[in-house]
């Protein structure tokens, strides 16, 4: 399967004349969604490795030129779910966090807060506790290696039962 050309969305652009270079200012990246942090090139690589065909709209990186019939919450959610279903291992989970930290460091971030719902990855790593342990462990390691302070926010899906959220809140509290 030939991978489509995927632009590097994290490469700094040249600073226009007369403007200050914003890459030199410290930044904080808040409420970064775990799967949403995935590099397009990583998504293509994971899909290729797993033999998964990605929906064409998932690689449409210029939202402004996307046709109106390709937009909307439910279309977005289906595309997001397609990307999330590629994260099926501890190695994939660690890769997402590591790359997000590297990208944020390259952009001048000093703080990153990544939010993840461990139930999405639990089936592949032995449960919600191991899933959260992997996320926290890699966040610590990536923080040490990149210099970006990384916080982890445990998220709960509003589409699931409220008792699931209570379980996740208790799990998060046990790591606080």
Protein language model annotation of sequence segments:
Residues 2-176:
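Metal-cofactor-binding active-site regions of metalloenzymes
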């Amino acid at each position: 399967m030939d991978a489509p050309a995927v632009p590097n969305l994290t490469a700094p652009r040249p600073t226009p004349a007369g403007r200050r270079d914003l890459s030199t200012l410290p930044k904080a990246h808040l409420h970064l969604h775990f799967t949403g942090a995935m590099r397009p090139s990583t998504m293509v690589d994971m899909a290729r490795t797993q033999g998964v065909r990605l929906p064409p709209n998932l690689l449409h990186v210029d939202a402004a030129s996307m046709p109106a019939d390709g937009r909307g919450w439910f279309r977005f959610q289906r595309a997001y779910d397609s990307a999330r279903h590629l994260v099926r291992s501890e190695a994939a989970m660690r890769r997402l966090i590591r790359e997000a930290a590297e990208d944020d460091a390259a952009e001048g971030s000093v703080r990153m807060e990544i939010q993840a719902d461990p139930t999405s990855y639990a089936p592949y790593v032995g449960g919600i506790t191991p899933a959260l342990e992997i996320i926290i462990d890699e966040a610590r390691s990536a923080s040490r290696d990149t210099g970006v302070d990384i916080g982890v926010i445990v998220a709960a899906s509003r589409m699931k039962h409220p008792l699931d959220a209570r379980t996740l809140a208790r799990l998060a509290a046990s790591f606080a």
